[in-house]
Amino acid sequence: MRTMVSDMESAPIPGCGIAVMAKASTPGCTKTRLVPPLTLDEAAQCNTAFLRDVADNILAASAQAPIAGYMAFGPPASKPFFQETLPREIGLIDAWYPNFGDCLLSSIVQLLERGHGSAVVLNSDSPTLPTSLLVETADMLARPGERVVLGPAHDGGYYLLGVKSARRRLFEDIAWSTEHVARQTLDRAAELELPVHILPRWYDVDDLRALKMLQAELFEDQSFALDLRPNRPQHTRVLMQALIENSDLQDRLTFNAFRRAAE
């Protein structure tokens, strides 16, 4: 398995490395499950806003815990997009494989090889994820002993997985992109006899229902979880506000919600 870590070579190594699994914003290739109600161009714009907000969220968490942020990206030719889009404090990791499990494992291996005591892979489409959950993850992984930290998503997947050593088995026999991912990952951890710390459930913005939840959090002050303070994603908020004001997005959201309900 190839490994390559780029940028930040002279930076100090905080205890916990967090790598966001990221794709460059290409219309027709990025966030296509949001089309409709979004157009292909709007979906790509959302991807860019999400990436910027997730990066900012990691940087905010790094002020409260020893955390360093990265983007695990592919293909390699997309590197300039991330260099131009993200804060310079965010490192870049090449993690491009046909199998998503290999992408995750490679990212973890590279973080640990860089010298981090723990490694976390994080999704790129939860811009309102509470910063406190990233801090909690780093704190749990800083404790003695092996463990897994898992952040389950509302759709049966997970938004975050943290470990202290690379265990290939955690990524084997997983039905990726299904509602079984989190449960199967817990099964793999049980096979390895690894204790698991489970974070509160959160949501991925990858379909109409989740897009409506995001809108409610941004503009209606409705939190996905009442006992958690969501991150306030400025880039996403500005983009969504502009799309609502300058296009018929609000009508499209309503129309598609009614259409899905009738199906």
Regions found by a protein language model. Name each.
Residues F81-S118:
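Short phosphate-binding loop-to-helix
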Residues R168-L186:
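Short, glycine-/small-residue-rich phosphate/pyrophosphate-handling segment
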Residues G117-D125:
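Short beta-strand-to-loop acidic/aromatic patch adjacent to the donor-nucleotide binding site
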Residues Q184-E263:
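Conserved alpha/beta core of the MobA/IspD/sugar-nucleotide pyrophosphorylase nucleotidyltransferase superfamily
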Residues I67-P75:
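Short beta-strand/loop segment that forms part of the nucleotide-sugar
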Residues M1-L34:
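N-terminal nucleotide-binding beta1-loop-alpha1 segment
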Residues N47-Q64:
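A short, N-terminal amphipathic alpha-helix
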Residues L129-D155:
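Conserved donor-nucleotide/metal-binding helix-loop-beta segment in metal-dependent transferases, i.e.
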